[in-house]
């Protein structure tokens, strides 16, 4: 398939708000992709580079586009040719790699027409937001393959990504999907929680009775045991086994030889309250001397879900059954504190106890809900003391006075799941230490998509920041019609992706509640 054809599909998908029309356009594109192009094409239609980041920043891309000759006419580039070129760019390393990447990029752009260049630029910078979200694309894959959409979504959940599932489903149908199952030793994306304004609202939303568990201020982990082999993965599915020998020892001591558990690892003070999140995260650095750090900064694991236990997979089992399996596998002192109740006063007291012990709050869970890996579903609702949201930095302004020379005033946005875009909710320069200002300036400069000498610098929407605020008010200034009151930065969440940010629906729910 020609890149120009895929770029036109992307443009058409972005132009229509109708979900069914998006599915129809994507279905036709998937049919036209050659078998060896399907995984790449599906990835690009979802706005992701098939091979990951290629090491080309906004400044390099802008310079290459400015230097490129007039857009090419003629047969143009194929999807396969472009994928191969991007993989060569990504693989360039060592002395001279920057120049090598630029040569490959120049050669690619020289063969591309203007629509192809626009598509490539957005794809490389992570800005291809066309509304072809995984749910829509999953429906398109299901339509072309003649399979139930739920089966495609489940396979994508277990694979951690849709493109390999699309390739298998389109080539082999149901037999291809059957290969995607939960395997001990291979991580799956964790289930996530939506935000509720309070425990009363959470109980009402979950039907009156729910399980409430402390929301620990630690690092999310997924621990796998197969006999003596234990592997531990982070929230982002990076293997961190070497960083957490305490977790490895705990699982090896468990009475069951086959386990996949979901939980948190946290550094605790002598009184049992948590160390700051940043302190816990020191144990997860990429350059790590565990033997030196562990004695002074031990980690304690607390688990709250069982995905495999009792000899079988439990993803589809109700939450109450998964908890019962966890009780049989892990001692009480290594499970999160939990209360099953339908009494709002009892739930509020449980929340206050968690907050008094220094934890973030509670998570309310529907007792009959399955484990929906990779989804921020309505079956889990998190409640914190002060309102906080995980938002994405969209731009930053240069500071003045004491903050001169630092990118200071952050533009903050919530995710719109309908479009894949981010909806701005306001700005803040509050809550930042000098160290944070220095760090974010360098990080945001690397993400810049516009000139650094302008007073306002737009950036790729990649940094997730936890923001506290006092309330939400109507505001005609911003596209979503809402703004945060007295927003201040609590911390950056480098363990979260932009897709993990809170949604504009969550913000509207908090405003309406």
UniProtKB/Swiss-Prot annotation:
Its EC number is 6.5.1.1. GO terms for biological process: cell division; DNA biosynthetic process; DNA recombination; DNA repair; DNA replication. It holds the Pfam family DNA_ligase_A_C. Its cofactor is Mg(2+). It catalyses: ATP + (deoxyribonucleotide)n-3'-hydroxyl + 5'-phospho-(deoxyribonucleotide)m = (deoxyribonucleotide)n+m + AMP + diphosphate. InterPro entries: ATP-dep_DNA_ligase, DNA_ligae_ATP-dep_bac/arc, DNA_ligase_ATP-dep, DNA_ligase_ATP-dep_C, DNA_ligase_ATP-dep_cent, DNA_ligase_ATP-dep_CS, DNA_ligase_ATP-dep_N, DNA_ligase_N_sf. The keyword DNA repair applies. The active site is at residue 215. CDD domains: Adenylation_DNA_ligase_Arch_LigB (cd07901), OBF_DNA_ligase_Arch_LigB (cd07972). Transmembrane segments: none annotated. It is an enzyme of class 6 (ligase). ATP binds at residues 213, 220, 235, 264, 304, 376, 382. GO terms for molecular function: ATP binding; DNA binding; DNA ligase (ATP) activity; metal ion binding. HAMAP family: DNA_ligase. Belongs to the ATP-dependent DNA ligase family. DNA ligase that seals nicks in double-stranded DNA during DNA replication, DNA recombination and DNA repair. This is Probable DNA ligase. It comes from Anaeromyxobacter sp. (strain K).
């Amino acid at each position: 398939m020609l890149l120009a054809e895929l770029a036109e599909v992307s443009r058409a998908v972005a132009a229509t708000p109708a979900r069914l029309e998006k599915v129809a356009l994507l279905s036709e594109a998937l049919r036209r992709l050659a078998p060896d192009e399907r995984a790449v094409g599906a990835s690009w239609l979802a706005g992701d580079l098939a091979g990951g980041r290629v090491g080309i920043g906004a400044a390099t891309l802008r310079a290459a586009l400015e230097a490129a000759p007039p857009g090419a006419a003629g047969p143009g580039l194929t999807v396969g040719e472009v994928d191969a070129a991007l993989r060569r760019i990504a693989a360039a390393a060592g002395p001279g790699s920057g120049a090598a990447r630029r040569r490959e990029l120049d050669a690619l752009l020289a063969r591309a027409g203007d629509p192809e260049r626009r598509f490539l630029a957005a794809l490389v910078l992570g800005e291809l937001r066309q509304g072809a979200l995984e749910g829509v694309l999953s429906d398109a894959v299901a339509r072309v393959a003649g399979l139930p959409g739920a089966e495609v979504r489940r396979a994508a959940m277990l694979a951690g990504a849709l493109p390999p599932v699309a390739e298998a489903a389109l080539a082999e149908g149901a037999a291809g999907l059957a290969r995607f199952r939960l395997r001990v030793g291979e991580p799956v994306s964790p289930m996530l929680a939506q935000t509720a304004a309070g425990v009363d609202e959470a109980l009402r939303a979950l039907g009156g009775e729910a399980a409430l568990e402390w929301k620990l201020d630690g690092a999310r982990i997924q621990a796998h045991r197969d006999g003596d082999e234990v592997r531990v993965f982070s929230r982002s599915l990076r293997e961190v086994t070497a960083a957490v020998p305490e977790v490895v020892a705990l699982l090896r001591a468990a009475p069951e030889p086959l386990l996949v558990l979901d939980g948190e690892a946290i550094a605790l003070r002598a009184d049992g309250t948590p160390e700051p999140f940043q302190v816990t995260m020191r144990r997860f650095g990429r350059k790590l001397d565990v033997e030196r750090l562990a004695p002074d900064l031990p980690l304690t694991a607390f688990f709250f879900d069982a995905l495999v236990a009792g000899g079988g997979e439990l993803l589809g089992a109700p939450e109450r059954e998964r908890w019962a399996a966890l009780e049989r596998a892990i001692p009480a002192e290594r499970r999160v504190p939990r209360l099953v109740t339908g009494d709002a006063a009892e739930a509020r007291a449980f929340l206050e106890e968690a907050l008094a012990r220094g934890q973030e709050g509670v998570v309310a869970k529907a007792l009959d809900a399955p484990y929906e890996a990779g989804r921020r579903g309505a079956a889990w609702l998190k409640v914190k003391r002060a309102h906080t949201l995980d938002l994405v930095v969209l731009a930053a302004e240069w500071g003045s006075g004491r903050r001169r020379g630092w990118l200071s005033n952050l533009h903050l946005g919530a995710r719109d799941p309908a479009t894949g875009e981010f909806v701005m909710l306001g700005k803040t320069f509050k809550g930042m230490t000098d160290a944070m200002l220095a760090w974010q300036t360098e990080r945001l400069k690397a993400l810049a998509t516009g000139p650094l000498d302008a007073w306002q610098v737009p950036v790729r929407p990649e940094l997730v920041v936890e923001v506290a605020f006092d309330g939400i008010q109507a505001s005609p200034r911003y596209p979503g019609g809402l703004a945060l009151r007295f927003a201040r930065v609590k911390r950056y969440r480098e363990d979260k992706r932009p897709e993990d940010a809170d949604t504009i629906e969550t913000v509207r729910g908090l405003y309406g509640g």
